[in-house]
């Protein structure tokens, strides 16, 4: 095959950051070895893909052979492309029917997945639609009057459209479930079972997840036909993520967070809380400290969540405070620090949270703020995951989580895939102060107490633009904040 077509491609700058064996331990295959159509290869290379990761090497040829797959691989190792690439190869652009259904548990993940489909398939003439709850149903119905080849969505909305006979799944030969453990939890299992009744009986099923509880195995026995099982989980946590804990009292957490902001070299950070109320209040307090931040949780309107997710992906703000809404599958490669302001209750939640950093074999840092009540949970999670969470040192080696060349971090494509839905609101939501994080911060232990940002002779690190640049929550919204 002539290689002249490659020279005409608009290939992005090479990502020169170091990677771990999570994505480098391959068999040496190339994407051309899978005999993909040239239009698809063009999209793959223009997206910055160079060689398939281990999960892609294993899954793509088996999926193209039209076998059912049950695949288990770590977060951030290329699972999405492992099912999107064969989907785009299997779908026939000239057949104006829904030929592939990709199911995901959250609206943000649906947006992200549909964007991957569009990015990799931009030369293939394949139409992708994303549909989720919280958006205008009429817009989705109107969109389905036009050709749709790949439908990406959350279970509730997909079932609604199929039940109304608006989404015709009778010729949908490929069914994909990402985050299968969550999709088959009590929240979604009955919906998924109902959706399957609208698909052809001989459809192909691809299930991907980082964990496989009993519910997934039961589903496999009932619905999959002699599935090919892939298990790349020699260990649960990503090799590139360094994990620490800081033992602090509840009232010290905010002070400790401020210390971390002044001490760490953060490209982008995600901070997790255990409740929506604490998400909003923490975002307000971070803004009061002079740092820009966004927040996101399930109670927000969908258009507001979309705006936050889109702008954080584009790097317009460096800090995002959120609930577990964004623990599933969200891929923002610029995130190099994850902070558990509230320590999670389960090992599964912990695994998905810290997996937002260290994406695709790169380096990341996870810091857990724990109090006296969290100590047993910390030990339990260490045992279940077979990992070690060390006490935070006085100085953290930057080589553990900072890329030498930050310009190499890829910028995601804009999330413009919610066709027919209303555009995101222009203003950020105003936090409703309904809970308290504790009293005024007290001095924290000496081993993790550098000078506070406002006490230093030099200004805060450049990676934290001040609020005056109108990034994050507009300061005028807090003109008369409640007293704490």
From Swiss-Prot:
Compartment(s) of residence: Cytoplasm, P-body
Catalytic activity: ATP + H2O = ADP + phosphate + H(+)
Main location: cytoplasm
Low complexity bias (residue ranges): 429-457
CDD domains linked: DEADc_DDX6 (cd17940), SF2_C_DEAD (cd18787)
GO molecular function, one term: ATP binding
Region (Disordered) residue spans: 1-23, 429-484
Class of enzymatic activity (EC top level): hydrolase
EC assignment: 3.6.4.13
GO terms, biological process: cellular response to glucose starvation; cellular response to nitrogen starvation; deadenylation-dependent decapping of nuclear-transcribed mRNA; invasive filamentous growth; mRNA processing; mRNA transport; negative regulation of translation; negative regulation of translational elongation
GO annotations of cellular component type: cytoplasmic side of membrane; cytoplasmic stress granule; P-body
Ranges where the Helicase C-terminal domain occurs: 240-400
Record key words, sorted: ATP-binding, Cytoplasm, Helicase, Hydrolase, mRNA processing, mRNA transport, Nucleotide-binding, RNA-binding, Translation regulation, Transport
Binding site for ATP: 73-80
Chain positions of motif Q motif: 29-57
SUPFAM superfamilies: P-loop containing nucleoside triphosphate hydrolases (SSF52540)
Compositionally skewed regions (Basic and acidic residues) per UniProt: 1-20
One Pfam family linked to the record: DEAD
PROSITE patterns: DEAD_ATP_HELICASE, HELICASE_ATP_BIND_1, HELICASE_CTER, Q_MOTIF
Domain Helicase ATP-binding intervals: 60-230
Family annotation (InterPro entries): DEAD/DEAH_box_helicase_dom (IPR011545), Helicase_ATP-bd (IPR014001), Helicase_C-like (IPR001650), P-loop_NTPase (IPR027417), RNA-helicase_DEAD-box_CS (IPR000629), RNA_helicase_DEAD_Q_motif (IPR014014)
Job description of the protein: ATP-dependent RNA helicase involved in mRNA turnover, and more specifically in mRNA decapping by activating the decapping enzyme DCP1. Is involved in G1/S DNA-damage checkpoint recovery, probably through the regulation of the translational status of a subset of mRNAs. May also have a role in translation and mRNA nuclear export.
Assigned protein family: Belongs to the DEAD box helicase family. DDX6/DHH1 subfamily.
Protein name, entry field: ATP-dependent RNA helicase DHH1
Organism (species): Eremothecium gossypii (strain ATCC 10895 / CBS 109.51 / FGSC 9923 / NRRL Y-1056) (Yeast)
């Amino acid at each position: 095959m002539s290689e002249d077509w490659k020279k005409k491609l608009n290939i992005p700058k090479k990502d020169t950051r170091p990677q771990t064996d999570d994505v480098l331990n391959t068999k040496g295959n190339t994407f051309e070895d899978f005999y993909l159509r040239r239009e698809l290869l063009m999209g793959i290379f223009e997206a910055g893909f160079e060689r398939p990761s281990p999960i892609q090497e294993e899954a793509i040829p088996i999926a193209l052979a039209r076998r059912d797959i049950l695949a288990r691989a770590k977060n951030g190792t290329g699972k999405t492309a492992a099912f999107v690439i064969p989907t785009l190869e299997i779908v026939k652009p000239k057949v104006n029917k829904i030929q592939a259904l990709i199911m995901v548990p959250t609206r943000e993940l649906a947006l992200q997945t549909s964007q991957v489909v569009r990015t990799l398939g931009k030369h293939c003439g394949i139409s992708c639609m994303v549909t989720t709850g919280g958006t205008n149903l009429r817009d989705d119905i109107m969109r389905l009057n036009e050709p749709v080849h790949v439908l990406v969505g959350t279970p509730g909305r997909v079932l609604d459209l199929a039940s109304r006979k608006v989404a015709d799944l009778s010729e949908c030969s490929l069914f994909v479930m990402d985050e299968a453990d969550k999709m088959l939890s009590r929240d979604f299992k009955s919906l998924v079972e109902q959706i399957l009744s609208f698909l052809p009986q001989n459809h192909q099923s691809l299930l991907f997840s980082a964990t496989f509880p009993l519910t997934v195995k039961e589903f496999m026995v009932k619905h999959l036909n002699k599935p090919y099982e892939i298990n790349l989980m020699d260990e649960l946590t990503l090799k590139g993520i360094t994990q620490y804990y800081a033992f602090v009292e509840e009232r010290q957490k905010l002070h400790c967070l401020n210390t971390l902001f002044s001490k760490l070299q953060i490209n982008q950070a995600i901070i997790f809380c255990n409740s929506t109320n604490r998400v909003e209040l923490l975002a307000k307090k971070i803004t009061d400290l002079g740092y820009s931040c966004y927040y996101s949780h399930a109670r927000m309107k969908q258009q507001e969540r979309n705006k936050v997710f889109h702008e954080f992906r584009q790097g317009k703000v460096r800090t995002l405070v959120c609930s577990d809404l964004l623990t599933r599958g969200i891929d923002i490669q610029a995130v190099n620090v994850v902070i558990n302001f509230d320590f999670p209750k389960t090992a599964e939640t912990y695994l998905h949270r810290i997996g937002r950093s260290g994406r695709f074999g790169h380096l990341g840092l996870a810091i857990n703020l724990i109090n006296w009540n969290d100590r047993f949970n910390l030990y339990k999670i260490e045992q279940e995951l077979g990992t070690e969470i060390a006490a935070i040192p006085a100085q953290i080696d930057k080589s553990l989580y900072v890329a030498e060349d930050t310009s190499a971090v890829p910028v995601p494509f804009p999330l413009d895939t919610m066709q027919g839905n209303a555009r995101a609101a222009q203003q950020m939501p105003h936090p409703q102060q309904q809970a308290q994080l504790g009293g005024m911060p007290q001095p924290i232990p000496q081993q993790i107490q550098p000078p506070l940002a406002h006490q230093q002779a030099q200004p805060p690190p450049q990676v934290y633009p001040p609020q005056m640049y109108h990034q994050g929550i507009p300061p005028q919204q807090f003109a008369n904040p409640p007293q704490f």
